[in-house]
């Protein structure tokens, strides 16, 4: 009996020492730098909107974009967030060249994605999030209906694939980002309905449920970040296909653009708190 008591006391003492030792060890600090990019885009635009005209228009597109990605705080190894915003301006002419159509728009979306690393240097992520698209087409030739609003609030399916490689001695990050709305609501007036009528109170049926049969958008980009130093050069391609059909109105907008900009990783550090030498950094890409 005495031997059993001695063994139990020894086990209890060992557990106490282990618990005190674990409690005394500080948790490893996790650092989550933000991968951000500022870009400009320029390329071609193709527009067809039967609310304004049955004729197709073609011209140029230009825009400014901002994007950021960061590992999530609650599970940084498995989850990342992405925020993207873009301002766009487009000018297109009809085939004869005697009519002009303008488009101005803003887009913003956020997504939380689950990521995996199937191969060394390769990261793949998939998730969902909200998206907002608001813009306006304008044709001066139309007297009664000179403008066509494009507004949608959607739930988007977002994905990305990032591959960290070296070209010679230069580190390069290749990234492909596709986004497709799954569902949501979008603005769709009746065929021939004047905006003045809407202003007077004719609001029936303006908001339509979006699905791939009446509202389809593919927004995708392929970029390469050339890491020359703390700040990287981003080059690549950005494209968007928008197709809507509601109230006998068909709209098609296609954009292909070259992308150039700067990107890099930024980390907010408090001057009152030193970074632990044991801190662990988890990147978004």
Predicted regions and their residues:
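Residues that define the transmembrane beta-barrel architecture of outer-membrane proteins
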Residues: 56-64, 79, 100-108, 122, ...
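Transmembrane beta-barrel strands of outer-membrane/channel proteins
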Residues: 36-46, 83-91, 126-136, 153, ...
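Residues on the lipid-exposed face of transmembrane beta-strands in outer-membrane beta-barrel proteins
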Residues: 62-72, 106-114, 128, 132, ...
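Short loop/turn motifs that connect adjacent beta-strands in outer-membrane beta-barrel proteins
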Residues: 25-34, 71-81, 115-124, 166-174, ...
């Amino acid at each position: 009996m005495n031997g059993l008591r001695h063994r139990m006391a020894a086990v209890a003492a060992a557990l106490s020492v282990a618990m005190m030792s674990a409690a005394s060890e500080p948790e490893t600090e996790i650092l989550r730098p933000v991968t951000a990019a500022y870009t400009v885009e320029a390329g071609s635009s193709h527009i067809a909107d039967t609310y304004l005209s049955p004729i197709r228009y073609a011209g140029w597109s230009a825009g400014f974009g901002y994007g950021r990605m960061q590992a999530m705080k609650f599970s940084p190894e498995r989850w990342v967030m992405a925020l993207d915003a873009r301002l766009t301006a487009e000018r297109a002419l009809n085939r004869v060249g005697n009519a002009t159509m303008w488009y101005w728009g803003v887009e913003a979306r956020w997504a939380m994605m689950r990521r995996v690393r199937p191969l060394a240097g390769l990261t793949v992520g998939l998730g969902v999030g909200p998206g907002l698209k608001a813009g306006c087409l304008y044709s001066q030739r139309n007297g009664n209906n000179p403008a066509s609003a494009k507004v949608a609030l959607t739930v988007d399916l977002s994905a990305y694939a990032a591959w960290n490689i070296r070209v010679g001695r230069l580190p390069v990050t290749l990234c492909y980002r596709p986004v497709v709305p799954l569902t949501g609501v979008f603005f769709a007036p009746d065929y021939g309905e004047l905006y003045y009528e809407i202003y007077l109170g004719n609001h029936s049926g303006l908001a339509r449920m979006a699905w791939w049969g009446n509202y389809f958008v593919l927004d995708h980009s392929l970029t390469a970040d050339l890491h020359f130093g703390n700040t990287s050069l981003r080059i690549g391609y950005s494209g968007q296909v928008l197709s809507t059909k509601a109230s006998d109105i068909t709209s098609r907008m296609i954009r292909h653009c070259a992308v150039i900009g700067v990107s890099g990783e930024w980390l907010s550090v408090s001057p009152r708190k030193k970074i632990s030498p044991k801190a662990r950094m988890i990147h978004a890409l």
